[in-house]
């Protein structure tokens, strides 16, 4: 099972919160103290809370559940996309479109259009169009890919949201809450943990910290999928009892 240690978190700078003047009092239980005007997060809380979240994600993945990685802050986008792809899951790394979950019917139509344009771009359809029309469709394709590329193969609502930066992604969290989708989120000292089922108190800006979170969640999802594949193989008679 995937777990993260205190040392991992210290090396990644997970314990560095925001300046004390920007703090959210709702995060008080998770703050150790302050140093040079910056809040220090109590990793005695973060380590077990993150490991509990990883166990939950692994369990979801073991039941063929879908994990949606969400991180649209500049520092998070690349890590979110890479980690989601590394475990065959889904991501939103550019901008959260209002209604992405709660208005799934409309989003599904946009995904259908994206796939149509993808087909047209490779089957020669674009070549038969005027330059202007081809350019317009290319731009439409790029825009849709940027917004929906990470969820185009999700095939329905996710089973859990993993979020970097609860404050920044509050719309995504609210939509998940409205639909009863569990939320795992990294919550910094300037944010409110409202609507988060699995709170991970930690730095949500430092690249090393973000990569630690995303790679650990990907490893947990892969671990869960491995269990699922092992069970499936046993059911199919591929694994003989020793």
Swiss-Prot record:
Asked if the keyword Cytoplasm belongs to this entry, the reply reads: no
Q: According to its record, what are the GO cellular component terms? A: cytosolic small ribosomal subunit
Asked if the record carries the keyword Transport, the reply is no
**What is the name listed in the Swiss-Prot or TrEMBL entry for this protein?**
Small ribosomal subunit protein uS2
Q: GO molecular function: any one?
A: structural constituent of ribosome
Give the keywords, sorted: Ribonucleoprotein, Ribosomal protein
Biological process GO annotation list? translation
Which family does the similarity line name?
Answer: Belongs to the universal ribosomal protein uS2 family.
Q: Please give the organism.
A: Shewanella denitrificans (strain OS217 / ATCC BAA-1090 / DSM 15013)
